[in-house]
Amino acid sequence: LERTFQTEYNFYSSNKDNNYIPKLYKYDDSKKDSEFIYEIIEKLEGNTLYYYWYKMDESERENTIKNLMEIIKKFHSKKPEGYNWASKIKNEVLSDLEECKDSFSSKEYDIIIKSINNYDLFLKDNRFALIHNDLHFDNIIYNNGILKIIDFNDSLIAPIDFEFRQLYSCQEKPWKYANIEMDPFQKPHDYKNIWNYIKQYYEELNDIKYLEQRMLIYNVWNSIRNLKKY
């Protein structure tokens, strides 16, 4: 838990002049006033984007994603050193797969193992940035057309396309990250254009080789990771 506070603080420190995140009023890891590390942040008006998306017409949805991409591009404007991304994803998939191996048939297991042989090729073209890393509608606050982003405790340095894996998955399972109240209102047909809007307004994504294959790899990575948890 303390590590996540530090991760979130690092993100705030890297985005001090960003008006699309809550203000960080105080961060204290000294444990002088309390036995815990704590932070005090701005309370935002509005509600998560899940409460509004299903009510929007398609023009409003497109404009919302356009505005969101401008915010995310600002997050991604800092360009850190990269690392062997393919190796990281391969190792994590293999490790998680081994832990939940019994959940797969031998045929399914073999398909996943064989697909990993392509990771070096598909995950070679990388543009690294400090990403939010948990970007879904429950972490996007909407208030009178204004968007703000919350919850930075999973942020990390990674390729920019990895940022959008959850929004990509909304095309098929839009309810996945919604709360119990909003879950029933999330329908795939309301998300059918979300990926196209993302690519339209974050132009650099279109320059990444094997983008669609990469998103499928991230889906495998995410699914096996969640299977291991639950």
Where does each model-flagged region fall?
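Basic, amphipathic juxtamembrane/active-site segments
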Residues: G145-I150, Y168
